[in-house]
Amino acid sequence: MKKILSLLCMVAASFAEGQSLAAPASARLSPAEQNIASKSLTNTPQQYQEFNALAAALVRRALETSDASYYAQAETALKRSLQLVPDNFEAEKIRVSILLGEHDFPAALDAAQTLNRRVPDDVMVYGLLTDANMELGNYKDAETAAQWMLNLRPGNLPALTRAAKLRELFGDAEGAYELMELALQSTSPADAEERASLLTQMGHLRLASGSADAAEKLLQQATSLIPNYPAALGDLAKIRIAGKQFADAVALLEQRYQAVPRAENLYDLAEALQLAGRHDEAKRAFADFGRRSLAESNAKDNSNRKLVFYYADKVQMPVKALDLAKQEFQWRHDVFTLDAYAWALHENGQEAEARKQIETALAVGIRDASLLRHAGEIAAKIGDTFAAESYLKQSVDLNAMDSERARITLAGLPQAAKQ
């Protein structure tokens, strides 16, 4: 497979401003993107559609690799497209995808709404609306947009995957799995990247439901298609941790971190090192995470939710945890931000508000072992042992990574609550 650099150099000369689309020398387009880009760039590179195709390929590659540098390259390609044909609709859609990838969700939502008013029956604009609303916690609006996708083009693949993500958030893991399975059946056997992504999401759903064996099979299928597929490695590590195979979990998370050296991945590796008894290495990894995460904390694309838990649980800085959680809460209200905010409130002794926020998150319907454990510990702190028992039992029943701590907390509840 040709390196992306060799493809991009073909268009560099056509940039009026002399801008370059150079990528890391080791970067590669997946086969589908290589086909699009090479076909386009060997025809007439002056045509705006070809720069759109290149930008779309780069966005997809950014999603596959979690390498944000591809978004800047995609933006450069879009600028050329828009110079050739100002305000062309496809370029504007791709620009929203870039905003989503850069985690500027409010700007993405605003831009997608503008495009929706311009062309009210474009399926993928509804997909962009779904994505932005999900990330911001506007779940009703996300559901409405996903339904429009299905109404306009029944059974289309992007709609199925988005509907599946919503079903999971609403607590219907089985329904989510069925939709992902339909999406997999609709995906070409030649599209290894898309199939690996879908298999990983299906494995995640089985793991979230406590079916570790089924999850393992699906995740292994994903890595057979794309060796060392980062998302699959992360979920395989969760299975190893749940099975107390901590050394194996460390090895998997080291592979993932080498492939995608992002701060949030370092945090997961540090936790696994701690569980494996490699305390000095864990301490260094946590400290490195803290420095890196703090440095990016004011950017939209950050690891602030992990940093909240680092401050709250690892270095006992509850005030910093709460300040950071409030910063995130100001602009997004998805269930995971609410969870981090609730936990920071709990660590600062603000139990009533903590309970309000965690119950707001759970009211969406999500069944997540960590959120349920947090809800249980908050309820226990307030003295509502019956609610605490209910939440903790649900966390334990999911048999996930956080279930062991829930089991320990449950065992420590007053006996009257368990009768």
Regions found by a protein language model. Give the residues of each.
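N-terminal leader/linker segments that initiate helical-solenoid repeat arrays
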Residues: 16-90, 101, 106, 110, ...
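Register position in tetratricopeptide repeats
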Residues: 60, 67, 101, 135-136, ...
